[in-house]
UniProtKB/Swiss-Prot annotation:
Responsible for the antigenic diversity for host adaptation. Expression in E.coli of a construct containing vlpD, vlpE, and vlpF yields antigenically distinguishable products corresponding to each gene. It comes from the Bacteria. The lineage of its organism: Bacteria, Bacillati, Mycoplasmatota, Mycoplasmoidales, Metamycoplasmataceae. Keywords: Cell membrane, Lipoprotein, Membrane, Palmitate, Repeat, Signal. NCBIfam families: Mplas_variab_LP. Disulfide bonds: none annotated. This is Variant surface antigen D. One of its GO terms (cellular component) is plasma membrane. Residues 33-168 are annotated as: Disordered. It comes from Mesomycoplasma hyorhinis (Mycoplasma hyorhinis). A lipid is attached at C30 (N-palmitoyl cysteine). Residues 1-29 form the signal peptide. Residues 81-164 are annotated as: 7 X 12 AA tandem repeats. The numbers of repeats can vary and is one of the basis of the antigenic diversity. Sequence repeats lie at residues 81-92, 93-104, 105-116, 117-128, 129-140, 141-152, 153-164.
Length: 168
């Protein structure tokens, strides 16, 4: 008797979780990802397959443009309300601009990667931290500029490229 009650509660909890997870996916597929409908004014421009609503001053045409102000709402719903634009991704945080990735944090701009943190810009890499920029592309950002490397920390600059800009 106890087991059936527990399994019913588990089933109800799982059903609620699936329902909550399905709502933002439906919203993303309909193109209305900002659930509270209160967009902040800004000049964000997005390109190509966009599911996140951008309201900051970032543009997705070449990495981060330096704006890291704003907040994100909705966890993995793709709803963003400040300084972020992303394409085909799920969980983004403030100030990031990325393509085909999953978990991003403030100030990162990357492509085909998984875990990024504040101030990093990288392409085809895995673990970055604040202020580092690891890239095999031409777009560099604040802090440091690294090319074709994997793990960088704040303020470091390892590069085999000719373009190195330290903005901080």
């Amino acid at each position: 008797m106890k087991k059936s009650i527990f399994s019913k509660k588990l089933l109800v909890s799982f059903g609620s979780l699936v329902t909550l997870a399905a709502i933002p996916l439906i919203a993303i597929s309909c193109g209305q990802t900002n659930t509270d409908q209160s967009q902040q004014p800004g000049s964000g421009s997005t390109t190509g397959g966009q599911s996140g609503t951008t309201t900051g001053t970032d543009s997705t045409t070449g990495g981060q443009t330096g704006s890291e102000s704003g907040t994100t709402t909705g966890g993995q719903t793709g709803t963003t309300t400040g300084g972020q634009s992303d394409s085909t991704s799920t969980s983004k945080e403030q100030g990031s601009s990325d393509s085909t990735s999953t978990s991003k944090e403030q100030g990162s701009s990357d492509s085909t990667s998984t875990s990024k943190e504040q101030g990093s810009s990288d392409s085809t890499s895995t673990s970055k931290e604040q202020g580092s920029s690891d890239s095999t592309s031409t777009s560099k950002e604040q802090g440091s500029s690294d090319s074709t490397s994997t793990s960088k920390e704040q303020g470091s600059s390892d590069s085999t490229s000719t373009s190195n800009m330290n903005t901080r």
